[in-house]
């Protein structure tokens, strides 16, 4: 009788643990990779853009050192380029070819790797091109050029 009761109790605990595991999603299932978080930022850029064509990730700078907390904002820096796909098509940008002489934008800000929290703070500025061997980023009133020269 005592062993039946212990067995029944153990069975109930196993059932509770199983149900708890199904209800509480694991942290790793909710965490994005650094690249996935940046691609999500590019999607947001395309959603909020008023420009005619979609942008696609062109270059991704090195990720920051590993941080265990996916909810902590991570600094990010990446470059996007205009594609041939019109924005209204809603086609995934990864399937679009880059537009010849399309606009290029340098983007900086922060992203989180947590799928539940969604704070993105990204600013993108158009890259005006190369001047005297230097890459220049321009805003309405001034340009900043980096590199040789």
Swiss-Prot record:
Keyword match Isomerase: no
Protein localization: Secreted
Propeptide: 30-130
Region listing for Disordered, in residue ranges: 61-80
Sites of Arginine amide modification: 148
Principal subcellular localization: secreted
Cellular component GO terms, alphabetical: extracellular space
The family this protein is said to belong to: Belongs to the cathelicidin family.
Protein name per UniProt: Protegrin-5
Organism: Sus scrofa (Pig)
Native organism taxonomy: Eukaryota, Metazoa, Chordata, Craniata, Vertebrata
Gene name of the record: NPG5
